[in-house]
Structure formats: C-alpha cells, structure tokens
C-alpha cells in the first residue's frame, strides 16, 4: 500500500512492545512510521516485520555511515527487509552514497534512499566544534548537492533549508524533515523547528513527528488535526 500522507510518526521507544502498542493506535492509511537505532538494536528486523503486518510503510532510520562496501550491504539488507525508506550519512562521501544507490538499483522493492545532511539538533557552535566553519544552511546545501550527484532520492534536512534545497536540487528531490512540532508544542531537543504548515509551505515532502503524537493521550486526534491543517 502506498499512501499520500506526508506524516511519518517516529516510534522512538526503547522496545518493540511499546512501539507496536502505539502503532496499533495509528492508521496506516494516514501515516507512515519510523524505526530508529535504539529499538532496532534491541529488537532487530522483527519489529519492522511486525509493523509491516500491521499495514505500515516503514522508514528505517539507521543513518548508515561506514566504508562503501559495508554501507552498500546494509542498504541492500534494508531493501530485502521491505522497508519504504532508508538513510545514510552524506558526510560518508560520494563513493559511499553511490555504492548504496547501486546496491539497490535493480531491487524489486527499491526503497527511497535518503542522505542525512546536518542533524537538526546541531547549530553553528556544534558544527564549529567538529571543524565545520560554515553555518548549517551552507553545509546542508553542500551535502545535499553531493547527495543528488551520488544518486540519492533526497535528504534529511531542517525545514528552514527546504526552499534553498528545492531551488538547488530540483522539485523532485525529496526533503525529509524532523523537528516538526504542531503549534503550541515544545521544541524538545530539536533546535531548528517549524510547524507542519510552515514545513509544507517551505517545500518539505515528508515530516517526521514524534512526541507531539506519541505522547498524546489521543494520538489519532493529533494526526487528524495535522492532516486537516495541511489540507
């Protein structure tokens, strides 16, 4: 099943039981779900399989970053798992990204292959500490253009950079954005945040939303409110 919703719910739980309990409260016709490092390390591919059985398309958010052969193998394994989207770190370089793209080029269920540019938790001072002298938007554009040249379908970026990246990389280049918070919710540990409407208007294709949905007493109502605001 392929859905048109831009909302991806981050199932950032320590174990599969909690993630699946939340997933059972959501509608796979309205949202996709994201599986990250902690739950995947604890539960492995079984959690992805369980989410598939519930009808969800899954974004496997493991941000692979290693030598080209290792990343290519990992991305191929993710494709074999049937995930809808998988990501790698753009800072791994062109050969690493090209290897990942080539590894799934002919896969029958090729997932969307996305590169991570600058983590949305990082600001100017964080970049300077790791030797990047440019401000985030400059580094993001540099890595996004490299990702496109390397065969990526799009990038993970902040919504603030979306307009710049659509102009630089084209309308078809997919932008996946965490740090999206519905109006009136806390920013949490994401430093560069926008509301869903602001993100949509900026050019974001897919919005990763976690705690505003998963920590709500009525997660389906929050999803419906977000989708209505985007209609």
From Swiss-Prot:
<feature type="binding site">
    <location>
        <position position="181"/>
    </location>
    <ligand>
        <name>substrate</name>
    </ligand>
</feature>
<feature type="binding site">
    <location>
        <position position="120"/>
    </location>
    <ligand>
        <name>substrate</name>
    </ligand>
</feature>
<dbReference type="InterPro" id="IPR001754">
    <property type="entry name" value="OMPdeCOase_dom"/>
</dbReference>
<feature type="active site" description="Proton donor">
    <location>
        <position position="63"/>
    </location>
</feature>
<dbReference type="GO" id="GO:0005829">
    <property type="term" value="C:cytosol"/>
</dbReference>
<protein>
    <recommendedName>
        <fullName>Orotidine 5'-phosphate decarboxylase</fullName>
        <ecNumber>4.1.1.23</ecNumber>
    </recommendedName>
</protein>
<feature type="binding site">
    <location>
        <position position="210"/>
    </location>
    <ligand>
        <name>substrate</name>
    </ligand>
</feature>
<keyword id="KW-0665">Pyrimidine biosynthesis</keyword>
<feature type="binding site">
    <location>
        <position position="190"/>
    </location>
    <ligand>
        <name>substrate</name>
    </ligand>
</feature>
<feature type="binding site">
    <location>
        <begin position="61"/>
        <end position="70"/>
    </location>
    <ligand>
        <name>substrate</name>
    </ligand>
</feature>
<comment type="pathway">
    <text>Pyrimidine metabolism; UMP biosynthesis via de novo pathway; UMP from orotate: step 2/2.</text>
</comment>
<dbReference type="Pfam" id="PF00215">
    <property type="entry name" value="OMPdecase"/>
</dbReference>
<feature type="binding site">
    <location>
        <position position="12"/>
    </location>
    <ligand>
        <name>substrate</name>
    </ligand>
</feature>
<dbReference type="InterPro" id="IPR047596">
    <property type="entry name" value="OMPdecase_bac"/>
</dbReference>
<keyword id="KW-0210">Decarboxylase</keyword>
<comment type="similarity">
    <text>Belongs to the OMP decarboxylase family. Type 1 subfamily.</text>
</comment>
<comment type="function">
    <text>Catalyzes the decarboxylation of orotidine 5'-monophosphate (OMP) to uridine 5'-monophosphate (UMP).</text>
</comment>
<dbReference type="InterPro" id="IPR014732">
    <property type="entry name" value="OMPdecase"/>
</dbReference>
<feature type="binding site">
    <location>
        <position position="34"/>
    </location>
    <ligand>
        <name>substrate</name>
    </ligand>
</feature>
<dbReference type="GO" id="GO:0044205">
    <property type="term" value="P:'de novo' UMP biosynthetic process"/>
</dbReference>
<dbReference type="GO" id="GO:0004590">
    <property type="term" value="F:orotidine-5'-phosphate decarboxylase activity"/>
</dbReference>
<dbReference type="GO" id="GO:0006207">
    <property type="term" value="P:'de novo' pyrimidine nucleobase biosynthetic process"/>
</dbReference>
<dbReference type="InterPro" id="IPR013785">
    <property type="entry name" value="Aldolase_TIM"/>
</dbReference>
<dbReference type="InterPro" id="IPR011060">
    <property type="entry name" value="RibuloseP-bd_barrel"/>
</dbReference>
<dbReference type="InterPro" id="IPR018089">
    <property type="entry name" value="OMPdecase_AS"/>
</dbReference>
<feature type="binding site">
    <location>
        <position position="211"/>
    </location>
    <ligand>
        <name>substrate</name>
    </ligand>
</feature>
<keyword id="KW-0456">Lyase</keyword>
<comment type="subunit">
    <text>Homodimer.</text>
</comment>
């Amino acid at each position: 099943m392929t859905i048109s919703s831009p909302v991806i719910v981050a199932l950032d739980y320590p174990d599969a039981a909690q993630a699946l309990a939340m997933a059972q409260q959501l509608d796979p016709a309205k949202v996709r779900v994201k599986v990250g490092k902690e739950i995947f390390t604890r539960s492995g591919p079984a959690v992805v399989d369980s989410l598939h059985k519930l009808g969800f398309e899954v974004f496997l958010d493991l941000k692979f970053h290693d030598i080209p052969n290792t990343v290519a193998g990992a991305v191929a394994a993710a494709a074999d798992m049937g995930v809808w989207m998988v990501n790698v770190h753009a800072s791994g370089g062109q050969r690493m990204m090209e290897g990942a793209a080539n590894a799934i080029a002919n896969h029958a269920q090729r997932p969307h292959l996305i590169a991570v540019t600058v983590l949305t938790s990082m600001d100017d001072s964080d970049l300077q500490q790791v030797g990047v002298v440019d401000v985030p938007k400059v580094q993001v554009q540099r890595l996004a253009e490299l990702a496109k040249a390397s065969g990526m379908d799009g990038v993970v970026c902040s919504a603030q950079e979306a307009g710049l990246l659509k102009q630089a990389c084209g309308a078809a280049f997919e932008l996946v954005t965490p740090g999206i918070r519905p109006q009136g919710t806390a920013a949490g540990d994401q430093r560069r945040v926008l509301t869903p409407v602001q993100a949509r208007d900026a050019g974001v294709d897919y919005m990763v939303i976690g705690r505003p949905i998963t920590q709500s007493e009525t997660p389906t109502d929050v999803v419906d409110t977000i989708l209505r605001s985007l209609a």
